Amino acid sequence: AIAANQNRIPLAKMAVEETGMGVVEDKVIKNHYAAEYVYNKYKDVKTCGVLEQDDNYGIKKIAEPIGVIAAVIPTTNPTSTAIFKTLISLKTRNGIIISPHPRAKKSTIEAAKIVLEAAVKAGAPEGIISWIDVPSLELTNLLMQSADIILATGGPGMVKAAYSSGKPALGVGPGNTPAVIDETADIVLAVNSIIHSKTFDNGMICASEQSVIVSDKIYEQVRNEFMKRGCYLLNAEQTEKVRKTIIINGALNAKIVGQSAYTIAKLAGIDVDENIKILVGEVESVELSEEFAHEKLSPVLAMYKASSFDDALSKAYRLIEDGGLGHTSSLYINTVTEKEKIEKFYNTMKTCRVLINTPSSQGGIGDIYNFKLAPSLTLGCGSWGGNS
């Protein structure tokens, strides 16, 4: 963990240089989080041997390593995910074989090497951490079929392949996180939090907000706050241009992932200021036929108007059902006066993380906005998302 943390800056630079995605400063933070926060949380947790013993009832709870973990690493968070998965594997005495994304193999392997060298120096077996030097779909599938358990972080296709491998799998699929802003919400807090979350590493954390659903009673105020804070509200013609840039041939356009709002606007043929933070498209449909209703992994945000709280719930439910089952949902609301609405929200959302008045990128991964939520860069989606 110390070795990984000491290399957080060069690893961040390497990841951005290799992939052409994200923000160096934010990747430094992610690497630090993956090493420091995870170590501090789990260093004193017993993971093997006798975990519990009750002599009165004659019961012992014993944990054993699973064996070899297949770790699929995404191009969006290569070094931080590699650090996280190798550390938790070492902590549980499991071997791990990493399958990097072809676009991020150099930085992913470098992160794994740093952790391996430090682990071996500390007495771990040689080869406890391994990787595929020349990654391919065939080798990744072979690895998943051969391992004892799979930790799969990646696109829907990769996660589906992990679930179809015949081995236990913990998959991190698409997020498509909706953020509902209730009429009782603190508007400045809500908008600032969403911008803070959505711009972090150019929107590549899978828990980041993909859509914002706003009560019609405060819609104009929220709209104005976004503009005041440096976001760009697209007009109808510009919205159509960005639509054609988000989805290409039925899939997310890789050219927009982790790019700045200015770069994406240029790709769409729209002239905006270089310092624009987020491109906001005001749309109506939450169906998959609406490109803005998809997960975008970039500083592009869909904005919906809700006629009531139930309408907002219905829209959020549909967005999750189509593109983010089991992942994350977010609500901005007065927590003192609106307890019934909050209860209705978390009972309706089929997500493992329901965040209240919290930036979803930073809040979803734990130990930042809520210290009781364990830190993790693998945000599993539970039974809703098909996890084992």
Residue ranges and their predicted role:
Residues 1, 270-388:
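Conserved C-terminal structural/oligomerization subdomain of aldehyde/semialdehyde dehydrogenase
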Residues 1-15, 19-23, 112-123, 147-151, ...:
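Structural signal for hydrophobic packing residues in well-ordered secondary-structure cores
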Residues 1-2, 103-104, 132-133, 209-211, ...:
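Conserved short loop/turn motifs at secondary-structure junctions
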Residues 1-60, 88, 228:
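N-terminal Rossmann-like NAD(P)+-binding subdomain of aldehyde/semialdehyde dehydrogenases
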Residues 6, 10, 64, 84, ...:
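Conserved active-site and cofactor/substrate-binding residues in soluble primary-metabolism enzymes
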Residues 50-189:
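Rossmann-like NAD(P) dinucleotide-binding subdomain of oxidoreductase/dehydrogenase enzymes
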Residues 67-71, 87-88, 94-97, 127-130, ...:
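Structural motif
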Residues 84, 91, 159-287:
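ALDH superfamily catalytic-core signature
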